[in-house]
Amino acid sequence: MKEASMPQTILATDLDGTFLGGNEAQRAALYEWIAQRRSEIVLIFVSGRGFDFMRQLARDLPVQPDHVIGDVGTSVATGADFAPIAAIDQWLDASWPADMAQQIDVIVRRHPELQPQPQHGGRRRSYFYRRPEPVQVAATELRRLGFDTLMSDNQYFDVLPRGVQKGSTLLRTLAALGLPEHRTLVAGDTLNDLSMFQTGLTGVAVSNREAALDHAITPHTNVYRSAQPGAAGVLDALQRFHQQGDFNGFISGHRLSQTTV
C-alpha cells in the first residue's frame, strides 16, 4: 500500500463507557466529527461485547465500524458483513483447543462466587463476581494451567487464552490489514483496555476511567488522561491526533499537545 493511500487516522476504541460513554450531546459530537471525515478515519470497535451486540450497534449508530474486535480480543471480523480474517482466526483457534473450556469449568466449579455471564462468545469464559479476594484464588489456579485472567470494572472476570487480549489482537489485526501502528489511537476506560495501552500505541484514557486503570497506566507515557468523559474524551484526543498525525512518543506527562484544534 502506498503512503498516499494510507488512512490518516485509525481509531481503535472500547465501547461501553468510552465510544458509547458520556451524554447524548457528547456522543453526537463525536459521531458527527467522524462522519464528516469518514474517508480519513478507519474505525475499529474493540470491546468485551460480542458480535450480536456490535451488529445491532452498527445498525443503530450514525457511523459504522470498518472492523471489530469482540469478546475481549478473542474474536475478530471485518467489513459490514462481519467477515472473518483468516490469519487472525487461525491464531485464535490455535490458542483455544477444544478441551480448554472443560479445563476452566473444572476449576471454576470450586469457586461458587464466580457466576457465569449469561451470554458471551469468542474463545473465552466470562463470569461476574462481587468480592475480589476469593476470585484472585481462582485466577491463580487458572494461570497455573496456562490461561490469562482479567478482572475489570469491579465485577467482570474473564478467562482467556494465554497471550490473547484486546491489545495483542489489535496489533495482529493492524498487521493483517496493513494498517500502520503509528497512525493508530486507542481509547478505553477499564482494566480490560489496559492491554491496548501496553502496546505502546498512542492512547487516551477517558475521565470516567476505572481507578485501577488510572493507577495501571501511570508508567505508560503513551497514554493521555483526558479530562473529558466517554465520547467527549475520545473526541478530545482524536481531534489533536488527527490534526498532528504521527506523534507517538510526543505526549509529555500523559498529555497531548494543548495546541488549539
Q: Model segments located where?
A:
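Short, Lys/Arg-enriched N-terminal segments with co-localized hydrophobic residues
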Residues: 1-5
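Mg2+-dependent phosphoryl-transfer enzymes with acidic/Ser/Thr/Gly-rich catalytic loops
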Residues: 160, 167-261
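Generic enzyme active-site microenvironment
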Residues: 12-14, 69, 187
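Conserved acidic, metal-coordinating active-site core of Asp-based
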Residues: 103-199
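Asp-based phosphoryl-transfer active-site loop
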Residues: 7-24, 197
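Active-site phosphate-binding/coordination module
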Residues: 24-116, 208
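Short, structured coil segments at secondary-structure junctions
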Residues: 61-64, 72, 145, 199-200, ...
